[in-house]
Structure formats: structure tokens, C-alpha cells
Amino acid sequence: MIEEDKTIKNFYSGQITVFMLMLFMIVSSVLIAQYHSAVYYACRADSERAGRLSVDSLLAGYVKPLKERYQILAFDGGFGEKEFSQEKINGELLDVYKKNIQSSVDKKNIINSTLDESLFTMLIENDWRFLLREITLNRVEFVREDGLETLMKMLKDKNNEASDTLQEERQEAERASQEETSESEEDKEDGGNEEKEHVDDPRDIVTDIWNRGILYAACPGEYQISDKECSMGDVSYPESGQEMQGEIDFKDEESIQGMFKKWDNIFDSDNMLKGTVEDAAAVWYMEEVFHNGTTHLKDSSDNYERVLEYEIEYIIAGNEKDEENLKSVLWRLLALRCVMNLSHILLSPEKQMQVTETAGVIGAALVIPYFIGVIAFLLKATWAFAESLSDCRALLRGKKVPIIKSDATWHLSWERMLSLNVNMLDGYEGNEGMTYEDYLKIFLLIQNRNEKYRRMTHLIEKNIRLQNEYSNFYLKNCIYGVQVTFQNEFSVGENYKVQTGLSY
């Protein structure tokens, strides 16, 4: 009986031992699993933290002059070299990642880390989205609807109207010439004895002034023209520029017709910028950070060195010489002003009468009375052109010129036109209307957006390269955002991928 009790006791004791052993194993397994889980999540948190710090560290190395001068944040993916270096960027990302891992509490539990994949958002994409985001920040609210499309349509219509009027006057003169009956020899002899009234033809004077060069004609006498020149062949997005057109003969209707045709392209609505509010805000940005032909008239603390002085003019025209860019912009400005000034003359009975009287004297002197209509129109075009030269000179002196002039804002009287010299083109002291910079905005707003932004990047690159440490700077290499994936091997036998991204 006693032996039987011992057997039963030993049996139950063995069962308890097995149960306790199993319980211990279960508890140990749970604890080990919890430990592994704790280690895994701790390593995971450290890995994610290291990933964020890695991309933070990379983008913190933005190009300082790009931020200071042009308010643009971007990282140079070329590291001061011409070519983009993804390998070097990946190495820097991984190096910073590993250093942050080593500084973590669970560094011993992260056995190995590698960079699995890196993707970059470039500052300059096809739609200019990220560049525009940077340069239009806090400027969009200042952009308003200025009725630009209406203005350009009006200019185009008036330019076409002037061209059509000249064509009609020419056709009428030719018809009158064909219908003119032959005079008798006696009438001719009698007419030949008549004393002809003489008048100086202002067309000769304006033609002479113009054909000495647009800078001579349209710049005030004291204006100092920049002689800076910069090759743009080594920029990220090179392209060719546009130069000013040739001579004009104000006594030749075909020459004037050619002038109107060239101007028609400037006012072509097909070239009109039909972009977003951001595109318009970008024009205000350009005015703030780039110089133009009147910047020297302002008090400015900006002492940055620049490859060109007429930067806005370069964006509009794209030539490598300041002088050529100024010529091209003045040509556009003359087109706009001349069309509007001619419209004013055609709507002024007093001015029309003055011109017609002079045209009659010139026609009589030339014995071509049936061409008086053509001569009168050419005189009106000449007057409008001379007034436009005066407008350009005033604008370059920091004065204002209204889009549509009145008798009160008109500078050159017809009496002055009949005795015109180049010095008379100066003296307009306009204080109402638009400044030179305002007219530049019009040209920028109607310019092709890709052309405009490419040329803007040319100036940014070339100006930054003037600093020795950025001599090989290229905007095409600049990164705006990064997305990276790191592969990690943990001591608990798990692998974990960290994916993180950041942009400016």
C-alpha cells in the first residue's frame, strides 16, 4: 500500500515537473518572441529615423548662391562638376545613413545596411513645375488680370489697319495716275513758270536718324550702353537669339509696308502666353532679381557681379551681347509705341489736317498730286515713328509713357517735325503711364514660356559660375526632391526596407 502510494506520488510529481518545464518553455518562448519583436521594432524605428536624417542631410546642402540671389532651393547633383553623379549622391546618402545607425541605441542589432534604390526629382522638368513653385512663392497673390490679351489684339488690329490704309492709298494713287489726262505742252509750260512752295521733308530727317542705328536713334544722348558680352554655348539648355531688323526708308511705301509686316509677328496672338497665374507671377519675379536697361537709375544694395547688364533684355531677345539685346527690345518697343502713336494721329483731325497740307506741298513740288494720299500717310507714319523714338528715349531716362497718348502727352508738334534734329527727340518728361520696366513685362508675358524660362536659367547659371567654387554649376543637375530605399539586416534574423522621401 505504501509502495503504491509512492508510485502514485512519483507519477504526479513527474507530471508536475513536465508541466512546469512546458510552462517554462512557453514563457521563455513568449519572452524571446517579445524580445525579438522589441529588438525588431527598435531597429526599425532607428532605421526609419536614420533614413529621414539621411535625406534631410542631403537636401540641407543646397546651393547657397542659388538661394541667396534667386530664392531657389536645390541640391547640386553634379557636386560642382558638369555631369550628374548619382553614384556619389548614393554614397553620401548611405554614408550618412550608416553614421546615424551607429549613433543609435540598437546599433549592434543592425548587422548590415545597403542602399537599394534612389529616385530624384529634378528642379527643372519639362513643365517647369518645381522651378515655378520656388520662384512664384508669395508672388501669386500680387498678380492681377491686366487685360493683356485685349491690348495685344488691339495692337495687332491697329497695325493691320495701318498697313491696309497704306495699301489703299497706294491703289487709289495708281488709279488716279492712270486716269490722269495728258496736259498740253502750253499748260506744262505755264505750270513750269509757277513758283513752287518749298518745305523740308521730315521723312528725310527721320530716315537719316534711324539709319545711323537704332541705338543712336532711340537712346538718349547721355545713355551709357553696356559693352558686356557672354557666350551661352555651355549652359544647360542653349539656344540662339534674335537680332533687330534692318534699315527703313520713310519715303518708300514698300519699306513701310515691310515694317508693318515685321511688327505683325510681334503682336501675333498665336505667340500669346496663355499660361497659369504662376507664369504671370514668374514675370514679377524676373523683374525683382534681374537687371535691365534702367536699373542703374535706382538706388540698389545689390552688388552681385553679372555676366550681362541687360538681363531682362537677354531673356526677351537671347543674344550674347548687351548691345544686341537692347537693340532687339527697342525694336519691339518702337513697334508698340509707333502703332499706338499712329492711331492717335489718325484719330486727330487737327494733326491730319497739318500733315495733309504738307503732303499737298510736297506732292505739288514733285508734280504727283494724285500721290498726295500716299505721301500724307507716309508723313503720318514718320511722325508716329519720330514720336516713338522720343518715347524710347524718355523711358530709358526713367520717365513714363502712356499706352494711348493724348494731345497733352504728345511731345513732337508738326512744326518741330518740319525742322527736326536728333536733339529734339529728347525732352519728353512724362510722369503718367507706364515705365520701361512695365513695357518689358508686356514683352515677357507674351513670350513663349519655354524660351523665357530657358534663358532665365542661362543667366542664373552663368552668374553663379562667376564664383570660383561654382565654376561648373549646371541647373540641369539640381535636385529638388529625393526618394530612397535602404535595405537592413537585423540580428534577430529579419530584413527590413526603409523607404523615405523629401523635397524642398
Kindly label every feature range from the protein language model.
Residues K64, I72-Y504:
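Long, compositionally biased low-complexity segments
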